[in-house]
Swiss-Prot record:
Assembly and interaction partners: Complex I is composed of 45 different subunits.
Similarity comment text for this entry: Belongs to the complex I NDUFA1 subunit family.
Gene behind the chain: NDUFA1
Transmembrane spans: 1-21
Any Gene Ontology CC annotation: respiratory chain complex I
Predominant location: mitochondrion
PANTHER family named among the record's database cross-references: NADH DEHYDROGENASE [UBIQUINONE] 1 ALPHA SUBCOMPLEX SUBUNIT 1, NADH-UBIQUINONE OXIDOREDUCTASE MWFE SUBUNIT
Intracellular or extracellular location(s): Mitochondrion inner membrane
Pfam families for the chain: MWFE
Classification lineage: Eukaryota, Metazoa, Chordata, Craniata, Vertebrata
Membrane topology (UniProt): Single-pass membrane protein
Role this protein plays: Accessory subunit of the mitochondrial membrane respiratory chain NADH dehydrogenase (Complex I), that is believed not to be involved in catalysis. Complex I functions in the transfer of electrons from NADH to the respiratory chain. The immediate electron acceptor for the enzyme is believed to be ubiquinone.
Protein name per the record: NADH dehydrogenase [ubiquinone] 1 alpha subcomplex subunit 1
Keyword Flavoprotein: no
Length: 70
């Protein structure tokens, strides 16, 4: 019957989801516990550049907060 395809469909769905989830965890691990940010728009790029300058270590994913602002 039609429901015999469900196990194969479930396996295929899991195989398609694993790379996306694994990529998110790898980015989170390599970027100091934060997810990877992408500056596709000019505004996002400016925010990343601002965070890079404010961090004090030239990395956008290291946040130091307000104590670094002069």
């Amino acid at each position: 019957m039609w429901f015999e395809i469900l196990p194969g469909l479930a396996v295929m769905g899991v195989c398609l989801v694993i790379p996306g989830v694994a990529t998110a965890y790898i980015h989170k691990y390599t970027n100091g516990g934060k997810e990877k940010r992408v500056g596709r728009l000019r505004y996002q790029w400016y925010l990343m550049e601002r965070d890079r300058r404010v961090s004090g270590v030239n990395r956008y994913y290291v946040s130091r907060g307000l104590e670094n602002i002069d």
